[in-house]
Curated annotation (Swiss-Prot):
SUPFAM superfamilies membership: Carbamate kinase-like
Chain sites annotated for binding UMP: 60, 80, 141-148
Amino-acid positions noted as binding ATP in the UniProt annotation, renumbered to this chain: 18-21, 61, 65, 168, 174, 177
InterPro entries in alphabetical order: AceGlu_kinase-like_sf (IPR036393), Asp/Glu/Uridylate_kinase (IPR001048), Uridylate_kinase (IPR011817), Uridylate_kinase_bac (IPR015963)
Name of this chain's protein: Uridylate kinase
Pathway linked to the protein: Pyrimidine metabolism; CTP biosynthesis via de novo pathway; UDP from UMP (UMPK route): step 1/1
The protein's assembly and partners: Homohexamer.
Organismal lineage: Bacteria, Pseudomonadati, Pseudomonadota, Gammaproteobacteria, Pseudomonadales
Free-text function comment from the UniProt entry: Catalyzes the reversible phosphorylation of UMP to UDP.
Record gene name: pyrH
Pfam family, one: AA_kinase
GO molecular function: ATP binding; UMP kinase activity
Regulation: Inhibited by UTP.
Locations listed in the record: Cytoplasm
GO BP, sorted A to Z: 'de novo' CTP biosynthetic process; UDP biosynthetic process
Amino acid sequence: MAQQGSGYQARYKRILLKLSGEALMGSEEFGIDPKVLDRMALEVGQLVGIGVQVGLVIGGGNLFRGAALSAAGMDRVTGDHMGMLATVMNALAMRDALERANITAIVMSAISMVGVTDHYDRRKAMRHLSAKEVVIFAAGTGNPFFTTDSAACLRAIEIDADVVLKATKVDGVYTADPFKDPNAEKFDHLTYDEVLDRKLGVMDLTAICLCRDHKMPLRVFNMNKPGALLNIVHGGAEGTLIEEAQ
């Protein structure tokens, strides 16, 4: 449940939190772990409790991966549409977890799904956010060939968020995959161009270029670290910050 009142001043007024679908699996190999949903709902609720406005984008990789089936012969557009539906399923699950924690949440889908979700409308989304309601943006951009990372950056720009927070399984951006390379070194700070030049694979090219062109800061952090999200909102240096060159 969101707790009202805090002695701390939040650094960010409005954030866009990007969660991977895989994050919802927890220790499972497929699907959604209810314990993970409840923990994430609690962390989001802490932000709402101190007055932070939260937009949320969730991937669909825990349920479906269109790109993989495309490589196996499925039509790419069909696969991407199926992937969008997977993100809607995750969004509905997250909304349910938030509401069980007494946090008002709205799902807005880029694909019209009357009776299931609200259709995405920027002005309505911003009104919901201003009313301290969590807005979950589903179905990506509504177009094939665009990732949910690109959708997250696009929505962040549209709703005038202060920062994009990308939750991952590692505590930032490394020179290589730290799970595979024990010598991988972590970056505390990067510019957009450094990410592109080094081909670090933080997000796809479209997402990084969107952030760069609109001067949208991006922080990559470990969602499995308790309190990391709240620490970031208070100005803590969790993970890796990516922004324009100073």
